[in-house]
UniProtKB/Swiss-Prot annotation:
Keywords: Cytoplasm, Cytoplasmic vesicle, ER-Golgi transport, Golgi apparatus, Membrane, Protein transport, Repeat, Transport, WD repeat
Bias-annotated ranges (Basic and acidic residues): 868-887
Main location: cytoplasm
Family, similarity comment: Belongs to the WD repeat COPB2 family.
Protein's GO biological process: intracellular protein transport; vesicle-mediated transport
InterPro entries membership: Beta-prop_COPA/B_2nd (IPR006692), Coatomer_complex_subunit (IPR050844), COPB2 (IPR016453), G-protein_beta_WD-40_rep (IPR020472), TPR_COPA_B (IPR056176), WD40/YVTN_repeat-like_dom_sf (IPR015943), WD40_repeat_dom_sf (IPR036322), WD40_rpt (IPR001680)
Native species: Arabidopsis thaliana
Acidic residues bias (residue ranges): 888-900
Phylogenetic classification of the source organism: Eukaryota, Viridiplantae, Streptophyta, Embryophyta, Tracheophyta
Full protein name: Coatomer subunit beta'-2
Region annotation (Disordered) ranges: 847-926
GO MF, one annotated term: structural molecule activity
């Protein structure tokens, strides 16, 4: 029966003719040496060229990674070997190695050796720890030496293939070959060793269009592989799969079964002749070099063939070898750490007659079924004895121990617990997959049908593309995984039973409401298991998650691909296995799962009884779960993390609890958040305290100003000044009427122009003092601009109502320290829009009216006022006449006044030059 290997193309890159290929053991890189003389490193994950080296203008026929040194070593037709550091791109070494074309280089797996073979019929050994000295020469071939390769089972020996039609086996340290195989009728192009431990085989490819498998112990030909129509240029035994791969100049790659030597598959990607095949251990990736580019394919799935029963006994298959280990064999004194490999004692259990592609325990763990090569064999788990066998593409167990076999897409057989055939089913559709469990499931490409095991009656058809299916042990829940998401369904067993008991006919789609969709999650499930009502799975990002009631929790981020084996309740751990069969455990408390399950079922009383058994360090996980269920009060009681409890308290509006947490944590952001919430909730005392802790001075300003708290504003002004919050300090002082302090603050903050403007508006008596400071400060930058500043004491005519402003200041200083209460607002509301100058003028009018009402002798007042008015009129007339004369003089001299110079002030009869103005000559000033 065929292997049915799934083959996926992972990379396709066109290029010049590819003469050799190699895979990096740790990086996602392919090394290709080209006939054009270039080395290319392709990243097969990103599908782009990562690096390239221009080696020579002649063909580079062979190149290999030396990962432990971060090197690439290459041999070319110019007879030189070159070594590059692929990280720094530096050339490490260049030396002439042969007297003719270099056909192949091979790197020793552990020692600092490189073998090279050439058209000069020689093989040379190079030691890079001795400065790339040639430590040995192997002579014996009578034609070109096309390839050399080390024996992976004995790295002291190597094989060479030559166009003299022979294969020679050599020992390092001996110049003569151990023996020679007359391999083919024409030249031998390639040779490779079998990597498994059970067969002393090697394979050769020749210009006679055949590949041959040899036993190098008996020196006999085991098998000849015929089918290619041109020279066989590349061969390999796959290190992980039981297959042989051959490539030919006929453009095809053929895959052969390594045991039966049957042709399994033929690949033809239309890139002309095949020249090279590359692979690495522990990977199912194979890279192929063609005339027109490079192809990488992935053969089969990389999921390890392993199974664990409910007692912790693990059985896995390495090729045809079956091994076992028991988790419980680890001593109780050993402290298991999450994510670390378990030190299991591995034992050989036996071998399998077919190549295992799947392996699974039955529900009680007594039997193990192995599937592969289109057959299945049932073994006893303890002694590994053959219990039953047969033909089948797939094999599944029922939850009761029965089983089903899919022999083809149109025939499924069901067997009893004793492996006796019960019935045969021929579905009305093409069954591409089957799944076991509580019900028997059959899938086509776009739907799945569930049947009962007893009579194979249709339960329900569901239109979904199914990749995998996982049943809970209870049989009430099932997870259906597709390529992009998974669904949790509830199986209504009682409804189905009552339907069949009633004798009602079943519809074409099955029993209505047999399944109820509970949850859908947009994550791809790689592997999964059920523990109670908890579904544990790892996703496409290799996160280990579990899902209870639709709420997904990430347990761990896996650092490499791992696959779920099972769960042991006695250890509260879930176990996984990687591709190298390392077993790793992670803690998942059963009490935690039970608690979440009970909450989902609404049994809160029983859940509260289990809560004390959950360790404190898991309480936050419980709280997050409760929050997702809308049980925020319960989450607040259980949560232990202060930050999380604070957020929950804020959600609930429990400000007192939030305040206690804030006192404990002393986080400025928390105090600020709590202060804003307290303010909006009307808890002003709490808001004040929070804002003080948070140093939220702006918030305190809003609070104190809203409350009319002069004492608070006074303290805030001092605090703001200490903290350097000058804006807040200024507003506080201004609200308190401490204008001199405001002015001083502006000066100290080096805001002298603003201080001058404020003094002009509120403290005109201080203007001269501030202008002097301004001139002094500005003169350091622009002396002309400093000279242009006008002092109102010197040029009062340029400042409207200057004398009135001085009088207003003297009058206003009496009321500045008086803070009117909020209750008096109505009597002051009408005056709020009146300026001080207007108020002063109104005051003058009121005084005049009071004088007219008899406070003084009317005639004396009138006489005095007339005298004053006369003097004022004379002064005004004199001032107007002087101003008129000055204006005429200015017009004669061509001087423009201040109003016509965009506000520039005249000093000593000339316009002051400003930084952005013009000089006296009309040119732009510096």
């Amino acid at each position: 029966m065929p292997l049915r290997l799934e083959i996926k193309r992972k990379l396709a890159q066109r290029s010049e003719r590819v003469k050799s290929v190699d895979l990096h053991p740790t990086e996602p890189w392919i090394l290709a040496s080209l006939y054009s003389g270039t080395l290319c490193i392709w990243n097969y994950q990103t599908q782009v060229m990562a690096k390239s080296f221009e080696v020579t203008e002649l063909p580079v026929r062979s190149a290999k990674f030396v990962a432990r040194k971060q090197w690439v070593v290459a041999g070319a037709d110019d007879m030189y070997i070159r070594v590059y550091n692929y990280n720094t791109m530096d050339k490490v070494k260049v030396f002439e190695a042969h007297s003719d074309y270099i056909r192949c280089v091979a790197v020793h797996p552990t020692l600092p050796y490189v073998l090279s073979s050439s058209d000069d019929m020689l093989i040379k050994l190079w030691d890079w720890e001795k400065g790339w000295a040639c430590t040995q020469i192997f002579e014996g071939h009578s034609h070109y030496v096309m390839q050399v390769t080390f024996n992976p089972k004995d790295t002291n020996t190597f094989a060479s293939a030559s166009l003299d039609r022979t294969i020679k086996i050599w020992n390092l340290g001996s110049p003569d070959p151990n023996f020679t195989l007359d391999a083919h009728q024409k030249g031998v192009n390639c040779v490779d060793y079998f990597t498994g431990g059970d067969k002393p085989y090697l394979i050769t490819g020749s210009d006679d269009h055949t590949a041959k498998v040899w036993d190098y112990q008996t020196k006999s030909c085991v098998q000849t592989l015929e089918g290619h129509t041109h020279n066989v240029s590349a061969v390999c035994f796959h290190p992980e799969l039981p297959i042989i791969i051959t490539g030919s100049e006929d453009g095809t790659v053929r895959i052969w079964h390594a045991t039966t030597y049957r042709l399994e598959n033929t690949l033809n990607y239309g890139l002309e002749r095949v020249w090279a095949i590359g692979y690495i251990k522990s990977s199912r990736r194979v890279v192929i070099g063609y005339d027109e580019g490079t192809i990488m394919v992935k053969l089969g799935r990389e999921i390890p063939v392993a199974s664990m029963d409910n007692t912790g006994k693990i059985i896995w298959a390495k090729h045809n070898e079956i091994q076992t280990a028991n988790i419980k064999s680890i001593g109780a004194d050993y402290e298991v750490t999450d994510g670390e490999r378990l030190p299991l004692s591995v034992k050989e259990l036996g071998t399998c007659d077919l190549y295992p592609q799947s392996l699974k325990h039955n529900p009680n763990g007594r039997f193990v079924v192995v599937c592969g090569d289109g057959e299945y064999i049932i073994y006893t788990a303890l002694a590994w004895r053959n219990r039953s066998f047969g033909s089948g593409l797939e094999f599944v167990w029922s939850s009761e121990g029965e089983c089903a076999v899919r022999e083809s897409s149109s025939k499924i057989k069901i067997f009893s617990k004793n492996f006796q055939e019960k019935r045969s089913i021929r579905p009305t559709f093409s069954a591409e997959k089957i799944f076991g469990g509580t019900l028997l499931a059959m899938c086509s490409s776009d739907f799945i049908c569930f049947y009962d095991w007893a009579e194979c009656r249709l339960i329900q058809r569901i239109d979904v593309t199914v990749k995998n299916l996982y049943w809970a042990d209870s049989g009430d829940l099932v997870a259906i995984a597709s390529d992009t998401s998974f669904y949790i369904l509830k199986f209504n067993r009682d409804l189905v039973t009552s339907h069949f008991d009633s004798g009602r006919p079943t519809e074409e789609e099955g029993v209505e409401d047999a399944f109820e969709v509970l949850h859908e999650n947009d994550e791809r499930v790689r592997t999964g298991i059920w523990v109670g009502d908890c579904f544990i799975y790892n996703n496409s990002s290799w996160k280990l998650n579990y899902c209870v009631g639709g709420e997904v929790t990430t347990m761990y981020h896996l650092d490499r691909p791992m696959y779920l084996l099972g769960y042991l309740a006695s250890q509260s751990r879930v176990f996984l296995v990687d591709k190298e069969f390392n077993v790793i455990g992670y803690t998942l408390l059963l009490s935690l799962i039970e608690y979440k399950t009970l909450v989902m079922r609404g049994d809160l009383d029983k859940a509260s009884e289990i809560l004390p058994t959950i360790p404190k360090d898991q309480h936050n996980s419980v709280a997050h779960f409760l929050e997702s269920r809308g049980m925020i009060e319960d989450a607040l009681e259980i949560a232990t993390d202060p930050d999380y409890r604070f957020e929950l308290a804020i959600q609930l509006g429990r400000l007192e609890i939030a305040q206690e947490i804030a006192v404990e944590v002393q986080s400025e952001s928390k105090w600020k958040q709590l202060g804003e919430l307290a303010m909006s909730s009307g808890k002003l005392q709490m808001a004040e305290e929070c804002m003080k802790y948070a140093m939220d001075l702006s918030g305190l300003l809003l609070l104190y100003s809203s409350l009319g708290d002069a004492e608070g504003v006074t303290k805030l002004a001092t605090l703001a000044k200490e903290q350097g919050k000058n804006n807040v300090a200024f507003l506080c002082l201004f609200m308190l009427g401490k204008l001199e302090d405001c002015l001083q603050l502006l000066v100290e903050s080096n805001r002298i122009p603003e201080a001058a403007l404020m003094a002009r508006s509120y403290l005109p008596s201080k203007v001269s003092e501030i202008v002097a400071l301004w001139r002094k400060d500005l003169s350091k930058v622009n002396s002309k601009a400093a000279e242009s500043l006008a002092d109102p004491e010197e040029y009062s005519n340029l400042f409207e109502d200057w004398q009135v402003a001085l009088s207003v200041e003297a009058k206003a200083v009496e009321t500045r320290g008086v803070y009117t209460g909020a209750k008096d607002y109505p009597s002051h509301a009408d005056k709020s829009s009146m300026t001080l100058v207007e108020a002063f003028r109104n005051l003058q009018v009121e005084e005049e009216e009071s004088l007219e009402n008899g406070d003084m002798d009317h005639e004396e007042v009138v006489a005095e006022e007339n005298g004053n008015e006369q003097r004022n009129e004379d002064d005004v007339a004199e001032h107007v006449e002087e101003h008129h004369e000055e204006k005429e003089a200015e017009e004669e001299e061509g001087i423009v006044d201040g109003d016509s110079t965009d506000g520039a002030v005249l000093v000593n009869g000339s316009e002051a030059d400003e930084e952005w103005g013009t000089n006296n000559e009309g040119n732009p000033s510096a």
